[in-house]
């Protein structure tokens, strides 16, 4: 079983842009699509507001990519690939909407303290 520090590290991913600038992002969730035979990761800038149904006008930057879970030790250690197909984007959007609307799919920080 992973220790608390390892679990915390697995909740974040660092992206490096073309200029070498690093940005920290919090992983919302990952999922696999049988239809596209790919795994996906969705994340938001670390420290940004939580996604809630109660505030429909809330704008939160969310990025989504596909990744190969076998290419690294975890999703935080694998290459990310852009989603370029509109149908694939629609599928990812549907999964995200389900995630936002279903409280049981999200974890709160208070649950992490156990």
UniProtKB/Swiss-Prot annotation:
Transmembrane segments: none annotated. It comes from the Bacteria. InterPro entries: UPF0473. Pfam families: DUF1292. Belongs to the UPF0473 family. NCBIfam families: PRK13678.1-4. This is UPF0473 protein OEOE_1164. It comes from Oenococcus oeni (strain ATCC BAA-331 / PSU-1).
